[in-house]
Amino acid sequence: MKKVYLAGQANEYENNWKEEFKKLRNFSFHDWEFDSDQTSPDTFFPDDLKGIKDADFMVANPGVAPSEGTWIEIGYFYGLNTKKPGNFCSKLIIIWKKERKPIWSIDFVNKTGYIVSSVKEAIQKLEEIARKHD
């Protein structure tokens, strides 16, 4: 079973976006809202990083608001899953909504992993790349 770390916005701010992933078969998920001790940064930060380190894939949804924590999670996963800086990470999916700003940064983000614009596209991409990594 492939493990997926779900990074990004909390369900309450993004229409329960993570719940659609959890319906998928053949995957297990680390959802920081439930699987990391949210008592304080002293507990959730190491729990989140352990979940990322143990993951085969990451789906990140930074939403449209500032998402500093999400970008830290993405960077850590990217660093663990590429051989050298600048490589494309074939295990990383980022949901980049069309209304996300600033738009100039999408050129940079495109170099990191797969960029999709919706949860539906992210689910399709996850299923596709999981087959390639069997």
Which sequence ranges carry the predicted segments?
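Conserved catalytic or regulatory cores that recognize and/or transform ribose-phosphate-containing ligands
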Residues: 1-134
